[in-house]
From Swiss-Prot:
Pfam families: RuvC. Mg(2+) 2 binds at E65. Binds 2 Mg(2+) ion per subunit. GO terms for molecular function: crossover junction DNA endonuclease activity; DNA binding; magnesium ion binding. Mg(2+) 1 binds at D4, D138. The active site is at D4, E65, D138. The RuvA-RuvB-RuvC complex processes Holliday junction (HJ) DNA during genetic recombination and DNA repair. Endonuclease that resolves HJ intermediates. Cleaves cruciform DNA by making single-stranded nicks across the HJ at symmetrical positions within the homologous arms, yielding a 5'-phosphate and a 3'-hydroxyl group; requires a central core of homology in the junction. The consensus cleavage sequence is 5'-(A/T)TT(C/G)-3'. Cleavage occurs on the 3'-side of the TT dinucleotide at the point of strand exchange. This is Crossover junction endodeoxyribonuclease RuvC. Homodimer which binds Holliday junction (HJ) DNA. The HJ becomes 2-fold symmetrical on binding to RuvC with unstacked arms; it has a different conformation from HJ DNA in complex with RuvA. In the full resolvosome a probable DNA-RuvA(4)-RuvB(12)-RuvC(2) complex forms which resolves the HJ. Its EC number is 3.1.21.10. The gene is ruvC. Its main location: cytoplasm. It is found in: Cytoplasm. Belongs to the RuvC family.
Length: 163
């Protein structure tokens, strides 16, 4: 399961890893919360939505975008609050969470750690064989996180085993 955390829009996706680098899309969506709603209610709505996804798809692992510093402190705080709620939902179900920075995801998917949103959307559409690009960008980002983890998990497992 790939999650692009956000309080206004949170991208959610589920993919199935195949042999080699084959990855198959299962579901993608976005949870929206109104900005005029109190933060605690928005977080509760996000928690309930991700819980429903856990019920519906029973993912074995979550790939979550790591919060990084942006110029807007309020945005960073809201994203961090959302990430905490999402990690809590996974932890309550015993689902491991793996975090990736935006540049790690971009490098994995496009080969360029500085790829723009349009390039990332084109790449994830092509990689997953989608007939149209996922919208909004939060949905594409959630898929990219899931694919990134599918591709990196075997290597991460080997590295951990040897250290």
């Amino acid at each position: 399961m790939g999650i692009d955390p956000g309080l206004t829009r949170c991208g959610l996706s589920v993919v199935q890893a195949g042999k080699g680098r084959a990855v198959y899309p299962v579901a993608v969506g976005v949870v929206r919360t109104p900005s005029d709603m109190p933060v605690e209610q928005r977080l509760n709505k996000l928690f309930d939505a991700v819980e429903q996804w856990f019920d519906d798809y029973q993912p074995h692992v979550v790939a979550l975008e790591r919060v990084f510093e942006r110029s807007n402190v309020s945005t960073v705080m809201n994203t961090a609050h959302a990430s905490g709620v999402l990690m809590l939902a996974a932890a309550r179900r015993g689902v491991d969470v793996h975090m990736y920075t935006p540049s790690e995801v971009k490098k994995s998917i496009s080969g360029n750690g500085r790829a723009d949103k349009a390039q990332m959307t084109r790449m994830i559409t092509r990689i997953l064989g989608l007939s149209e690009a996922p919208k909004p960008p939060d949905a594409a980002d959630a898929l990219a996180l899931a694919v990134c983890h599918c591709w990196r998990a075997p290597l991460n497992h080997l590295v951990k085993g040897k250290l």
